[in-house]
A protein has these predicted regions:
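Core of compact, soluble alpha-helical bundle domains
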Residues: 1-101, 105, 109-111, 115, ...
Length: 152
């Protein structure tokens, strides 16, 4: 009986791993569109970011924002494949948060952009016919939370 349970557990883990790889595949295939759409929605919600004096006002700054969103999406994809947000180093994210603070990048919109990407990714997964994808939320929520936390 114990061997049977072990085999069943292994089958479940294999199926879970395969599903996670499929999710990462959908994210990878659609990454450029996910980021582009999220950035567009973000700047519609926060037009002051791309206005004179905003942190994404120049082409160079805008491109850095897009680059950072790509990094966040990639980190989420890695965490999904790994099976959870534990692979995301909280200290690294806290350091990134401190860097953004020192550069005058508002953290609320960064966290909002990450949440927008989560929503878009889940829409892409639904369109691809994938179900039972609640595990996708964890890395996006974790990064958004750590990035937007403030030290007291």
């Amino acid at each position: 009986m114990a061997n049977r349970e072990v085999r069943e557990t292994q089958k479940e883990q294999q199926a879970d791993g395969e599903k996670r790889r499929q999710v990462a595949g959908v994210i990878g295939t659609n990454a450029a569109e996910v980021v582009k759409t999220a950035v567009s929605l973000l700047f519609q919600e926060y037009p002051e970011l791309v206005s004179p004096g905003g942190c994404a006002y120049t082409t160079r700054r805008y491109n850095k924002c897009v680059r950072d969103m790509n990094y966040f999406l990639r980190m989420c994809s890695y965490a999904i494949v790994a099976g959870g947000a534990s692979v995301l180093d909280g200290r690294m994210l806290a350091g990134l948060r401190d860097t953004f603070n020192s550069l005058g990048i508002p953290l609320g919109p960064v966290a909002r952009g990450i949440q927008l990407m989560k929503k878009i990714v889940k829409e892409k997964l639904a369109t691809a016919g994938m179900t039972n994808i609640a595990f996708v939320d964890e890395p996006f929520d974790y990064i958004a939370r750590v990035i937007s936390e403030t030290e007291i």
